[in-house]
């Protein structure tokens, strides 16, 4: 290796990221997972991490709400709301009746989105509770951010006219998302796991860059990886800006009708 040809220079991801900033990250969590190693997820620590990665605002959900107590976790998050935090409500899919009531309460509080944690709550896409919550969220005009395998979790939202962001779309399963989303204009995906050489470009070519939203899952995943993939993609500058927050702003900060 030689310095002259650049091969001996250490890899500098930030040099490749350049001036890219994220206006709104669609996948951020406050709190910790009690059953795994990881950061405590204190709000001030998470916001500091985001700032260090040029992420100016985030759609944030509470792991306390997802894993322990829905209402107190949601209330704690709503109380923390700041310009850089878009609060995202959480419901318990194991309690569909209570979940529907919580959706009504969240909507009345002005919350614009709800996040589903099917894997953490042990709920499968075919359970009646998921379809029930999907219908109620659509009726209330709430944007749904959902985990789970997109090959299964697209089904409960089909035909509802809902705005849904699939947070766990892996590039292995991108084709399934593309064919499902072709008939559902409200289907969107996080870019967190679309880190193959052509996943972003393929999705933009098939559906338009308006269906892609930058997501990091900070602080439990590394924000730099999807940031680097977006910065080095073959998308046009205006498409990159849309993915880096413009699309999320359109969904999550639009005026309520």
Predicted regions and their residues:
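Short, well-ordered coil/turn segments that N-cap beta-strands
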Residues: 19-22, 53-58, 82-88, 109-112, ...
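Active-site neighborhood of phospho(di)ester-bond hydrolases with catalytic His/Asp-centered motifs
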Residues: 24-26, 59-62, 88-90, 115, ...
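Mid-to-C-terminal alpha-helical segments outside catalytic/metal-binding sites
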Residues: 1-26, 40-57, 224-257
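Active-site gating/metal-coordination segments in enzymes
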Residues: 56, 68-145
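Divalent metal-dependent hydrolysis catalytic cores, especially in the metallo-beta-lactamase
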Residues: 23-29, 33, 37, 44-68, ...
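Catalytic pocket-lining loop regions of alpha/beta-barrel enzymes
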Residues: 126-213
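Active-site environment of divalent metal-dependent phosphoester hydrolases
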Residues: 31-33, 65-69, 94-97, 121, ...
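Conserved, mostly hydrophobic/aromatic
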Residues: 27, 50, 77, 106, ...
């Amino acid at each position: 290796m030689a310095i002259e040809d650049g091969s001996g220079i250490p890899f500098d991801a930030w040099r490749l990221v350049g001036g890219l900033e994220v206006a709104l990250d669609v996948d951020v969590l406050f709190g910790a997972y009690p059953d795994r190693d990881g950061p405590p997820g204190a709000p001030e620590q998470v916001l500091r991490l985001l700032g260090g990665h040029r992420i100016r605002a985030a759609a944030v959900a509470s792991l306390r709400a997802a894993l322990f107590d829905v209402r107190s976790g949601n209330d704690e998050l709503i109380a923390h709301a700041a310009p850089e935090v878009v609060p995202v409500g959480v419901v318990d899919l194991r309690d569909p009746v209570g979940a529907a009531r919580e959706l009504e309460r969240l909507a009345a509080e002005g919350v614009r989105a709800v996040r589903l944690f099917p894997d953490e709550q042990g709920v499968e896409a075919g359970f009646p509770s998921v379809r029930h919550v999907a219908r109620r969220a659509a009726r209330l005009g709430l944007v749904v951010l959902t985990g789970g395998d997109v090959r299964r979790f697209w089904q409960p939202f089909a035909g509802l006219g809902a705005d849904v962001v699939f947070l766990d779309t892996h590039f292995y399963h991108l084709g399934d998302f593309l064919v499902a989303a072709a008939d559902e204009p409200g289907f969107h995906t996080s870019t967190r796991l679309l880190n193959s050489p052509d996943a972003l470009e393929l999705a933009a070519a098939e559906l338009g860059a308006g269906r892609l939203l930058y997501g990091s899952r900070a602080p439990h995943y590394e924000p730099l990886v999807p940031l680097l993939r977006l910065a080095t993609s073959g998308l046009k500058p205006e498409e990159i800006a849309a993915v880096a927050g413009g699309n999320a702003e359109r969904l999550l900060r639009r005026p309520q009708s």
